[in-house]
A protein has these predicted regions:
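Extracellular carbohydrate recognition and processing domains
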Residues: 138-172
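Short beta-strands within extracellular/lumenal beta-sheet-rich domains
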Residues: 84-109
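Short beta-strand-plus-loop segments that form exposed binding edges in beta-rich domains
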Residues: 181-190
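Short carbohydrate-recognition loop motifs
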Residues: 68-88
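Intrinsic low-complexity, repeat-rich intrinsically disordered segments enriched
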Residues: 1-64, 68
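Beta-strand acidic-aromatic groove motif in beta-rich domains, primarily in extracellular
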Residues: 108-111, 122-133
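A short beta-strand element within beta-rich, extracytoplasmic domains
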Residues: 107-119, 199
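C-terminal interaction-tip segments
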Residues: 190-209
Length: 209
């Protein structure tokens, strides 16, 4: 097989077409790192936080967020909705697991992103959203404490916005499983109808490949 060797750098202003294989192969660690790549979390994969065999109810109840907007395909997309918190206090949860993909860079950035706000009217008190995340020990328990370092931010606005929660990545490795739970907390004194609403949840990761 013919072989041509080049010494030093090569600059190619156009495309390179390779008919065979790259030998030796390019290791994942040699690929440029992409910071905070987005991975969607499907609402249909979320569970009742204290009964993981149960999916979220269609209507929020007790301490569980509801999976709404799923009955009018082509008109509405699914979203999470709390119970009516008008003139009361509501604290409701949703839980999911997320396995870090092979391309995640061990020990690097990991975040949870939630796009949320008030559904119909703002509370005359408070509305916050928070996240906790624990690393599974792969034996039915968790390793360490809550990895989320971000305090629950205010989301009491009719203009929905994205809230970001930092997950400490020091002990995270590709293939590891995170057990995540979000909580919406609303306190209101005299408003007729007040709902927490979330339209998107994502995991953001530093990756290579």
């Amino acid at each position: 097989m013919a072989r041509t060797e080049f010494q030093g750098s090569i600059f190619v202003p156009g495309d390179i077409t390779i008919a065979g294989n790259i030998v030796p192969g390019i290791s994942r660690s040699s690929i440029v790192q992409e910071d905070l790549a987005e991975y969607g979390v499907s609402f249909t994969e979320m569970r009742v936080h204290d009964a993981l065999s149960s999916l979220l109810p269609a209507t929020a109840t007790a301490d569980d967020l509801g999976l709404a907007g799923s009955t009018t395909y082509g008109t509405a997309s699914p979203y999470l909705l709390s119970s009516n918190a008008g003139s009361t206090t509501v604290t409701q949860y949703a839980r999911w697991q997320f396995q870090l993909p092979p391309e995640y860079v061990a020990g690097q950035s990991c975040r949870v992103s939630i796009h949320c706000g008030a559904g119909t009217a703002v509370s005359d008190g408070t509305m916050t959203v928070d996240v906790s995340a624990y690393l599974s020990d792969d034996e039915g328990a968790v390793s360490g404490s809550d990895l989320v370092t971000t305090s629950g931010p205010d989301c009491n606005s009719l203009t929905m916005s994205t809230k970001s929660f930092v997950v400490t990545g020091t002990t995270l490795t590709p293939g590891a499983t995170l057990d995540c739970r979000m909580v919406a907390a609303v306190t209101d004194s005299a408003t007729a109808t007040v709902y927490f609403k979330a339209g998107r949840v994502k995991m953001l990761l530093d990756i290579q490949g």
